[in-house]
Amino acid sequence: MAVYRCGKCWKTFTDEQLKVLPGVRCPYCGYKIIFMVRKPTIKIVKAI
């Protein structure tokens, strides 16, 4: 399940909510530019 964020109102929504409107638009404000939110990962770097 992918999570997306709107470029205008910054609300997050899932891909099921994205399928409600035709095309790729924010289901809250209708803005066309959306970003896919990455899962927070921790990168461990070994100290020298």
From Swiss-Prot:
Subcellular location, record wording: Cytoplasm
Entry's Gene Ontology molecular function annotations: DNA binding; DNA-directed RNA polymerase activity; zinc ion binding
Catalytic activity: RNA(n) + a ribonucleoside 5'-triphosphate = RNA(n+1) + diphosphate
EC number: 2.7.7.6
Amino-acid positions noted as binding Zn(2+) in the UniProt annotation, renumbered to this chain: C9, T12, C26, C29
Binding note for cofactor: Binds 1 zinc ion.
Positions of transmembrane segments: none
Any GO CC annotation of this UniProt entry: cytoplasm
Keyword entries, A-Z: Cytoplasm, DNA-directed RNA polymerase, Metal-binding, Nucleotidyltransferase, Transcription, Transferase, Zinc
Keyword Protease among UniProt keywords: no
Enzyme class: transferase
The organism's place on the tree of life at top rank: Archaea
InterPro entries: RNAP_P/RPABC4, RPABC4/Spt4, Rpo12
Cofactor: Zn(2+)
Keyword Transferase belongs to the record: yes
Family: Belongs to the archaeal Rpo12/eukaryotic RPC10 RNA polymerase subunit family.
Function recorded in the entry: DNA-dependent RNA polymerase (RNAP) catalyzes the transcription of DNA into RNA using the four ribonucleoside triphosphates as substrates.
Listed NCBIfam families: PRK00398.1-1 (NF001604)
Subunit structure as annotated in this protein's UniProt entry: Part of the 13-subunit RNA polymerase complex.
Protein name from the UniProt record: DNA-directed RNA polymerase subunit Rpo12
Species for this entry: Saccharolobus shibatae (strain ATCC 51178 / DSM 5389 / JCM 8931 / NBRC 15437 / B12) (Sulfolobus shibatae)
